[in-house]
């Protein structure tokens, strides 16, 4: 057979396809990143040839990264056994498990992370905004952005909603709820901050008004008595003002795996004596 002749597979002429471009992951699998346009017929043929090679090599999980420009390959990939794993604005990630043993591919992210910011000034007044159309005065809240620190998110949310600059002091408490956002769980961190400016410039999109409110007045809102979370937050703040409660302070660290900066939040007994304003 010459180099130009196609080989036979089960008596049928079989065209040779190059294996899809891939790199090994750290867990015995492969990551396929499609960058060159490909029609569905050639993709399926190349994918099947790739599977043959990966099985011989003992590969396990296959991660298929399809950018928006390769949306035509989603349906054929699913028909070949891939399932969705997660999506980002510019790509869809699909996965396939080769061995007959149970899959060990990790699930997609399970939680959304949010913050609430308690800002107390020297007059023991809290910073509140009135939620549009609700008549409820609330502390600044929001979602932590990808790659953003918890304390930085709290500072940002206060600035965005009220125009107030703040300094992070500690995490007072956090709670977990389930099926909160598209069936995902929710982690909510209540942060204590100290104001460094006082000129309120409210955000018009989400809140109707913003003001400094006496701690006693905020605690007397009907919603505070009806909602366990609000009630507990006020109770914790009250204990903090009495110096009988210590939250979690941040400590910069580097991880075991790399030298990237992270933060450990820990409870230090001496924090109970730290003034909040």
Curated annotation (Swiss-Prot):
Regions annotated as coiled coil = none
Which reactions fall under this protein's catalytic activity? ADP-D-ribose + H2O = D-ribose 5-phosphate + AMP + 2 H(+); NAD(+) + H2O = beta-nicotinamide D-ribonucleotide + AMP + 2 H(+); NADH + H2O = reduced beta-nicotinamide D-ribonucleotide + AMP + 2 H(+)
Where is the motif (Nudix box)? 142-163
Q: Which Gene3D superfamilies match?
A: 3.40.630.30, Nucleoside Triphosphate Pyrophosphohydrolase
What's the EC number here? 3.6.1.-, 3.6.1.13, 3.6.1.22
Q: Which Pfam families match?
A: NUDIX (PF00293), Nudix_hydro (PF18290)
Positions of Mg(2+) binding: 157, 161
Q: Which residues form the Nudix hydrolase domain?
A: 97-235
Name of the molecule in the record: Nudix hydrolase 10
